[in-house]
Amino acid sequence: MSKVCIIAWVYGRVQGVGFRYTTQYEAKRLGLTGYAKNLDDGSVEVVACGEEGQVEKLMQWLKSGGPRSARVERVLSEPHHPSGELTDFRIR
């Protein structure tokens, strides 16, 4: 399977509820690299790179609501080409 990278923006109640940390846990469990970071508008930006099927699983997890404490309203995503090598999944 081919390697892909996506960038996603997750909207709803996703800050202050452990969203980035549980996203990091899920991404690492799936063998992905990238990051999750809070944005000023209250959303979370997620970059995920890895095997296409594993990236799709993370996207399904995000769209299904992520952690129990979060309330995801919508997820937007598009292909992404990071400027540097991502060697781990980090919180930014």
UniProtKB/Swiss-Prot annotation:
Taxonomic classification: Bacteria, Pseudomonadati, Pseudomonadota, Gammaproteobacteria, Enterobacterales
Note: Has a considerably reduced catalytic efficiency compared to other mesophilic acylphosphatases. Shows a considerable resistance against urea denaturation since the full enzymatic activity is maintained in the presence of urea concentrations approaching 6.0 M and that only a slight decreae of 10-15 % was observed with higher urea concentrations.
Enzyme class, UniProt record, top EC level: hydrolase
NCBIfam families: PRK14426.1 (NF011000)
InterPro entries with a match to the protein in the record: Acylphosphatase (IPR020456), Acylphosphatase-like_dom (IPR001792), Acylphosphatase-like_dom_sf (IPR036046), Acylphosphatase_bac (IPR028627), Acylphosphatase_CS (IPR017968)
SUPFAM superfamilies for the chain: Acylphosphatase/BLUF domain-like
Alphabetical list of PROSITE patterns matching this protein: ACYLPHOSPHATASE_1, ACYLPHOSPHATASE_2, ACYLPHOSPHATASE_3
Species of provenance: Escherichia coli (strain K12)
Temperature dependence: Thermostable. Retains 85-90 % of its activity after 3 hours of incubation at 90 degrees Celsius.
Protein name from the UniProt record: Acylphosphatase
Active site: 20, 38
pH-dependent activity: Optimum pH is 5.2-6.5.
Any one of the GO BP annotations: response to heat
